[in-house]
Regions:
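Short, surface-exposed ligand-recognition loops at beta-strand->loop->(often short) alpha-helix junctions
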Residues: 1, 96-108
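Single conserved hydrophobic/aromatic residue that forms the stacking wall/gate
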Residues: 2-12
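Glycine-rich beta-strand-turn "strand-cap" elements at beta-sheet edges
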Residues: 13-30, 53-89, 123-142, 164-194
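Short hydrophobic/aromatic beta-strand micro-patches
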Residues: 32-34, 96, 144-146
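Short amphipathic alpha-helices within nucleic acid-binding modules
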Residues: 37-49, 149-161
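Extracytoplasmic/secreted envelope proteins and their assembly/folding machinery
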Residues: 42-45, 55-58, 107-114, 154-157, ...
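Short glycine-/aliphatic-rich beta-strand segments at the starts of folded cytosolic domains
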Residues: 89-96
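Long compositionally biased, domain-poor regions of proteins
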Residues: 118-122, 146-152
Length: 194
């Protein structure tokens, strides 16, 4: 059963395991679905909750949900590839906007940074995730940096140090938000429109 295929919608589905995380015992994995828009997300959810085959599959999962969070994800840039089978790395950082900075202002500056980074050879994808129902933290947004392969994150860090740190686009982000509490997850892309 595949909710994405049945709805004829583009979605990306990942199963990510915590790797660098402050509490590895808190959960075994994080299931991530990315939909093109809210209408597709909730059509997929309707199929998942109403379809007897989906319910039977859900009952067979080796784990129970401990938390489900609905989010809005603002795509900033894409990694080199999002093909199914890629073993990806995703780094999430909780961020609080500093006084006087709107989420839109931060987004626009981050888009400028990511565009410049990719024009200069960076292969990492970036998103801003705005948590909604089910979220119990106090972050204004979650900053996601993700790669098509685990090793690409290390290459991306070195590229940032040598090529991106001293750019005007990176300096424009300084002081807009405080981001910390980083966690890194790894896992396969299970389903992709590619």
């Amino acid at each position: 059963h595949d909710t994405c295929r049945r709805q004829r919608q583009m979605c990306i589905r990942d199963s990510l395991q915590p790797y660098f995380h402050r509490d590895l015992a808190s959960h075994d994995f994080m299931w991530v679905n990315n939909w093109p828009d809210s209408a597709a997300q909730f059509k997929g959810l309707e199929v998942w909750t109403k379809d007897p085959k989906a319910n039977a599959l859900f009952a067979k999962l080796p784990a129970k949900n401990s938390q489900v969070v609905s989010t809005v994800q603002w795509a900033i840039s894409q990694p080199r590839s999002t093909d199914a089978g890629n073993f990806i790395l995703a780094q999430y950082n909780s961020c609080k906007l500093n006084e006087g900075t709107s989420l839109r202002t931060y987004y626009d500056a981050y888009v400028d940074f990511a565009k410049m980074a990719q024009e200069n050879g960076d292969v990492q994808g970036r998103k801003l995730i705005i948590p909604g129902p089910g979220y119990d933290g106090d972050a204004d947004f979650i900053r996601l940096v993700y790669t098509s392969a685990v090793s690409e994150r290390g290459e991306g860090i070195e590229f940032w140090r040598s090529e991106l740190r001293d750019t005007d686009e990176r300096r424009a982000l300084v002081g807009m938000a405080d981001c910390g509490n980083g966690s890194i997850y790894v896992g396969p892309v299970l389903r992709s429109p590619n």
